[in-house]
């Protein structure tokens, strides 16, 4: 098991101070006060940072200098998800703003391919439009 500690931790219900996550493989085994962390557990201390679950954004037009309408490709999508991940957003729905059927189809293919490859963080596709009045 490994511990990740931070000055502030949000457990989904409350803000906790001086607590840690106890992680077993890919799963959170416990949230506990620092004093209760097993002494043999390797610990990553995030210092004065805040530890919280990853955020989900269901309408993402772009990120990392890429607008999904302009670059609805696998590479564009990878740049967007990577940019959002840096700021705590772990899952997104890339959005195509009202555009042509060809752009919408290309975007749908990029999202479908990313999901088929098991790329983390792409929940689906948000299509707007096809037209705004």
Predicted regions and their residues:
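Short, glycine/charged-enriched secondary-structure capping and boundary segments
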Residues: 18, 71-73, 107-109
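Histidine-rich, glycine-flanked metal-binding segment
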Residues: 2-3, 9-53
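Divalent metal-dependent hydrolysis catalytic cores, especially in the metallo-beta-lactamase
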Residues: 61-63, 78-110, 120-133
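Hydrophobic pocket-lining residues within nucleotide cofactor-binding pockets
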Residues: 9, 51, 68, 96, ...
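Acidic/polar N-terminal loop/beta-strand segments that form early-domain functional surfaces
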Residues: 24, 34, 61, 71, ...
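Short amphipathic alpha-helices and their capping/turn segments at secondary-structure boundaries
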Residues: 39-42, 46-49, 107-119
């Amino acid at each position: 098991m490994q511990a990740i500690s931070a000055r502030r931790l949000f457990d989904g219900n409350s803000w906790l101070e001086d607590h840690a996550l106890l992680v077993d493989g890919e799963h959170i085994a416990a949230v506990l006060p620092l004093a209760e962390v097993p002494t043999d557990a390797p610990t990553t201390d995030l210092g004065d940072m805040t530890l919280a679950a990853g955020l989900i954004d269901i309408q993402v037009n772009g990120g990392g200098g890429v607008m999904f309408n302009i670059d609805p490709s696998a590479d564009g999508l990878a740049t967007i998800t990577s940019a959002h991940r840096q700021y705590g957003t772990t899952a997104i729905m890339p959005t195509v703003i009202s555009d042509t059927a060809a752009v919408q189809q290309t975007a749908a293919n990029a999202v479908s391919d990313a999901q088929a490859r098991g790329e983390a963080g792409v929940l689906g596709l948000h299509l707007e439009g096809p037209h705004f009045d």
